[in-house]
């Protein structure tokens, strides 16, 4: 199986960092393009006023930009074609939507993210993507 387009959801966790490393190795082997993707969610994060909420949105966007910029620099240093994007929403829905619309051949993602809730083997986002994605999903521990 050849993977020309690989989607790599990132959240800044150790597991997503390992997924990035694995995707770089796969991209080298298959001469693939990587698409680095971050989803932030502010569900239940409404502040006491609009100004606080706007500040929270800006922080989430800034964090997403930072995660993507660092990962993009790493990928480019390996001579791999890369694109980046971030969006707001439900992580599972947005990752699956992006994978379908972009017609990706593979999703490479970390086993667990930044959530404080620990699942036994994999996180709820990873599990949701596995169940709903149309392409293969590689989970990296």
Model-derived regions: residue spans:
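Structural beta-alpha unit
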Residues: 1, 73-107
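Small/aliphatic-rich secondary-structure junction motif
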Residues: 2-50, 74, 78
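Histidine-centered beta-alpha loop that forms part of the nucleotide-sugar donor binding/catalytic region
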Residues: 11, 89, 111-114
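Gly/Ser-rich helix-loop-strand patches that form or flank binding pockets
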Residues: 25, 97-141
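Generic structural signal for helix capping and beta-alpha/helix-loop junctions
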Residues: 44, 92-94, 116
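Conserved beta-strand positions in the Rossmann-like core of class I SAM-dependent methyltransferases
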Residues: 35, 83, 138
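A short acidic, glycine-rich active-site loop
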Residues: 53-66
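Short glycine/serine/threonine/alanine-rich loop segments
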Residues: 32-33, 80, 104, 135
């Amino acid at each position: 199986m050849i993977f020309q387009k690989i989607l790599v959801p990132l959240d800044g966790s150790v597991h997503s960092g390992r997924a990035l490393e694995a995707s770089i190795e796969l991209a080298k082997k298959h001469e693939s393009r990587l698409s680095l993707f971050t989803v932030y969610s502010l569900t239940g994060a409404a502040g006491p006023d609009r100004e606080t909420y706007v500040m929270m949105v800006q922080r989430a966007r800034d964090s997403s930009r930072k995660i993507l910029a660092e990962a993009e620099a790493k990928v480019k240093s390996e001579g791999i074609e890369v694109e980046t994007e971030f969006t707001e929403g439900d992580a599972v829905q947005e990752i699956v939507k992006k994978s379908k619309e972009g017609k990706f051949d593979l999703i490479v993602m970390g086993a667990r993210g930044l959530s404080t809730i620990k699942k036994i083997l994999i996180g709820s986002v990873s599990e949701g993507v596995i169940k709903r994605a149309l392409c293969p999903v590689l989970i990296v521990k």
